[in-house]
Regions:
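Solvent-exposed loop segments that connect transmembrane elements
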Residues: 1, 35-70, 109-138, 176-200, ...
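Face-selective signature of the C-terminal outer-membrane beta-barrel domain
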Residues: 4-182, 214, 291, 338, ...
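Residues on the lipid-exposed face of transmembrane beta-strands in outer-membrane beta-barrel proteins
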Residues: 9-13, 80-86, 150-156, 209-213, ...
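Membrane-embedded beta-barrel scaffold of Gram-negative outer-membrane proteins
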Residues: 10-12, 18-38, 214, 220-222, ...
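Transmembrane beta-strands of outer-membrane beta-barrel pores
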Residues: 27-31, 88, 99-105, 170-176, ...
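Gram-negative outer-membrane beta-barrel transporters
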Residues: 90, 159-164, 172-173, 289-300, ...
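Structural signature of Gram-negative outer-membrane beta-barrels, strongest in the C-terminal barrel
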Residues: 90-94, 98-102, 138-298, 349, ...
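C-terminal beta-signal and adjacent terminal beta-strands/loops
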Residues: 229, 389, 398-414, 434-481
Length: 481
């Protein structure tokens, strides 16, 4: 069950004709109550009490064990945006400040059925005494991300046909919080509780320079350079990996190894740093609005996700890693046409991505495609206006295949998980809706998504997948105050 709430308040004041002051306050809340169930095979390798060190180890296989998770996720975002725009004789200058605080909380409890009977590879056996118990995992998370951003942007009209733009932004980001895992219990393992505290501060800077030339009334060409950054989300600062250092019970010589045992570790994730050059044109041809651009983006420390599962967060493991350096070269095309009551739109994005500096741990080699990035994205849109207030809107969206990296459990429980490659297939979906404009400040939209019941996966690995919903219906209302 998911509950979303969103509140926004906008205010604009013009003390002079050439000065505009604007402010926005917003708050977003999301509460999710999740109950999931999974069936997994549990493997335990243990050297029981009473045996000489290393002289005897038994592998216990518990097949088809049912586990249930009850969890509550809370996300709260609130922020403030201040902006002032001043128009002068040959242009305009904008000053701004952004503030945002995001709080993520999680409280989850996972318990398997009681482990009792197992197979050691030769025969079926039964646990004894206090080792007859379920696997229990508890997690509590409270993480905060707070950011302060300051920026200035200037547009200078060098001539009637040439505009020059410059901009600068700085952001200070603070992370604070903790993640408590435990007390966790399972057969042959002493109860364990681990806590990770996060207290980090990042400072990032961005800038841009651009030029736009109007070669005729309807046509313009532009060139821009941008140096940017992307800061990590608070929940990306920790990994969930297999725990190979479980505490042994009193009397046991070797620590046990359990395939479903996990722990959280700090990953020291860095911010992404980007350098982008873009050249584009926009004009009208034969009554059609057309735009095209080519761009090249080099990213240092691009953040990528390596995950093990998609259906049950209780048994899912993940790692966030910075890729040394990546490159994207792309072409973007857009067009719009109007024929009476009909409006058509098309867009096409072609991307060629590659890794410039490898990350061996993530199995990313020089020349590989960047994970989770499709090479092609295309959209087709149609809109028919029945009246000035009522319109039929349809959209077709296509994504091509993309590569991923995923975590696969190692056969040797004394070693960390393996990383393998996987390719996710492409798909296209069609949405259809009716838009009603009540007035200049509000509208209502009702419709259906994926009207042809296209089968594809929201998330997937080479072993499992989370199917996307088939046809779904929605009601959307927008109001401006």
């Amino acid at each position: 069950i998911t509950k979303d709430k969103s509140y926004t308040f906008d205010y604009e004041y013009r003390p002079k004709n050439n000065l505009t002051l604007a402010a926005t306050i917003y708050k977003q809340e999301q509460d999710r109550d999740i109950q999931t169930e999974s069936i997994d095979d549990i493997r335990i390798v243990s050297s029981p009490a009473g045996y000489t060190y290393g002289s005897y180890k038994e592998e216990m296989n518990f097949y088809g064990v049912t586990s249930k998770m009850n969890a509550k996720f809370e996300e709260d975002k609130k922020g403030l945006k201040l902006k002032s725009k001043y128009d002068y004789s040959n242009g305009q200058i904008i000053f701004g400040y952004d503030y945002q605080k995001a709080v993520n909380k999680r409280d989850s409890f996972v318990q398997s059925e009681t482990l009792k009977s197992y197979n050691n590879g030769y025969s079926n056996k039964t646990l004894e005494g206090e080792d007859i118990q379920p696997v229990i995992n508890r997690v509590k998370v409270n993480m905060e991300k707070e950011s302060h951003g300051f920026y200035v942007f200037n547009k200078f009209d060098a001539t009637n046909k040439l505009d020059i733009t410059t901009g600068f932004r700085t952001e200070i980001t603070k992370y604070n919080g903790k993640r408590v895992n435990g007390p966790n219990t399972m057969p042959f393992v002493a109860a364990k509780t681990a806590e990770i505290n996060t207290d980090r501060r990042l400072e990032n800077y961005a800038g841009e320079f651009g030029a736009l030339y109007k070669y005729r009334d309807t046509g313009r060409v532009f060139l821009r350079y941008e140096k940017g950054f992307v800061t990590p989300f608070a929940n990306q600062l920790t990994d969930k990996v297999r725990d190979t250092t479980l505490p042994k019970k009193v009397g046991f010589f070797d620590p046990p190894q359990v395939n479903v045992a996990s722990k959280y570790v700090d990953n020291n994730l860095k911010s992404e740093k980007t350098d982008t050059v873009e050249l584009g044109v926009r004009d009208y041809f034969f009554g059609s609005l057309f735009s095209a651009s080519v761009f090249l983006t080099d990213t240092k420390d691009e953040i990528t996700l390596i995950s093990s599962g998609v259906t049950n967060p209780a048994v899912n493991r993940w790692k966030y890693r910075n890729i040394g350096k990546t490159r994207r070269m792309g072409l973007e095309l857009e067009a719009e046409q109007n024929f009476g009551n009909w409006s058509l739109s098309q867009s096409l994005t072609l991307l060629n991505t590659k890794v410039l500096k490898a990350n061996e741990e993530a199995r990313l080699e020089k020349g590989d495609q960047v994970p989770l990035v499709p090479r092609v994205k295309a959209t087709l849109g149609v809109k028919y206006n029945f009246t000035d207030k009522i319109a039929l809107v349809g959209t077709y969206t296509y994504f091509s295949k993309r590569d991923t990296r995923e975590i696969r459990e190692s056969e040797d429980l004394n070693k960390d998980d393996d990383i393998i490659k996987h390719t996710i297939g492409g798909y296209g979906v069609t949405d259809l809706g009716v838009l009603y404009k009540a007035d200049a400040y509000s509208n209502i939209k009702v419709g259906a998504k994926n009207i042809f019941n296209k089968k594809y996966n929201l998330r997937e690995t080479s072993l499992e997948a989370l199917p996307a919903p088939e046809k779904t219906y929605y009601l959307e209302m927008n109001v401006r105050f």
